């Protein structure tokens, strides 16, 4: 098949290249892998190109896009499409003071450091003296570790206990040994500001109750259990949302079914409600790990192959090529 890849960023790889720290995934390996796809297999990678439906929605990384293409045009010009746009929309709780400029998300924090280190911007990300990261997943751990490497005193605060942290006991204990102060069973209730500048974060102590809809113990506020941590930078790592290239109204017009959380609905073959459109990765599942995302991409590739074969009546043999 002739394969074209569209990516809004200046380098291929998405979050692997522009957010996940180098000590987890060396970005040069990702870029070299993409180069190998071009040189050995003839894949065309169109960078700095954003795909949209109707009006483009601004998300992290869009500033690099020099060209936009509508998804309607792709549907006309290609035999099959695979959407793998991930989760680029971060969540910040609606609490007093959250609109302060020193409040950011783990994704934004890591992304801005990466584009600065790559030399794509001369604007250095903010370096705080006391940085508080809220969350218990890998994004929280990565942001805390990056903040620690800037020389800041770093607190990582999670509303459940270390046992329930999505990043796992090993990761939390590791960054504790490096110097991050981990505080469990606490949830932010207010960003304390002075002249619109962050000065501290007020937390509510929590206890664990019966399991919630996720199956994990539900955090329950302890009356009167409030405390504050001095901070000049607050980083929220409280979840990311799927970012398909089209929102609900545009999706309905095209006939593409989205789930309530904004993820793309697919069947067991990774096929969407539009037969020629497939989807894979976090835009389907929500935030996950690299392994499952890659696995779903491979599954989608096989499904596209068999679907095109059935459509044309020509079954082409399928073989996997392992690249170095």
Please tell me what each predicted stretch does:
Residues 1-50, 58, 91-96, 142-185, ...:
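Beta1-alpha1 glycine-rich phosphate/pyrophosphate-binding loop at the start
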Residues 99-128, 211-287:
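FAD-site-proximal beta/loop scaffold in flavoenzymes
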Residues 1, 118-152:
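Rossmann-like NAD(P)H-binding beta-loop-alpha module
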Residues 174-178, 187-199, 207-209, 299, ...:
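Mid-to-C-terminal Rossmann-like scaffold of FAD/NAD(P)H-dependent oxidoreductases
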Residues 57, 92-94, 115, 143-144, ...:
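Short glycine-/acidic-enriched loop or helix-start segments at secondary-structure transitions
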Residues 31-95, 190-202, 207-210, 231-235, ...:
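Feature captures the FAD/FMN-dependent oxidoreductase FAD-binding
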């Amino acid at each position: 098949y002739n394969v074209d890849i569209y990516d809004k960023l200046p380098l291929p790889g998405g979050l692997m290249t522009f957010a996940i720290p180098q000590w987890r995934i060396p970005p040069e390996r990702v870029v070299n892998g993409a180069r190998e796809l071009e040189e050995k297999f003839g894949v065309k990678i169109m960078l700095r190109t954003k795909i949209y439906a109707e009006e483009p929605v601004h998300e992290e990384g869009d500033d690099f896009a020099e060209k936009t293409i509508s998804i309607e045009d792709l549907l006309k010009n290609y035999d099959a499409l695979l959407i793998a746009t991930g989760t680029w929309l971060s969540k910040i709780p609606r609490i007093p003071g959250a609109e302060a400029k020193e409040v950011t998300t783990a994704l934004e924090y890591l992304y801005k450091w990466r584009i600065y280190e790559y030399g794509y911007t001369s604007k250095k990300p903010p370096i705080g003296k006391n940085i508080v990261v809220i969350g218990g997943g890998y994004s929280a751990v990565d942001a805390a570790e990056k903040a620690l490497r800037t020389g800041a005193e770093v607190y990582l605060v999670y509303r459940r206990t270390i046992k329930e942290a999505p990043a796992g006991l090993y990761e939390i204990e590791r960054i504790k040994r490096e110097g991050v102060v981990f505080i469990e069973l606490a949830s932010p209730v207010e960003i304390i500001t002075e002249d619109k500048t962050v000065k501290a974060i007020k937390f509510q102590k929590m206890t664990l109750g019966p399991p919630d809809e996720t199956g994990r113990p539900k955090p329950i506020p302890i009356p009167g259990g409030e405390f504050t941590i001095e901070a000049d930078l607050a980083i929220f790592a409280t979840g990311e949302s799927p970012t398909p290239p089209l929102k609900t109204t545009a999706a309905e017009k095209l006939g593409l079914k989205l789930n309530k959380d904004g993820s793309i609905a697919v069947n067991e073959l990774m096929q969407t409600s539009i037969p020629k459109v497939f989807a894979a990765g976090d835009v389907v599942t929500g935030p996950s790990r690299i392994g499952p995302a890659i696995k779903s991409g491979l599954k989608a590739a096989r499904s596209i192959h068999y679907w095109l074969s059935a459509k044309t009546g020509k079954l082409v043999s399928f073989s996997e090529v392992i690249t170095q």
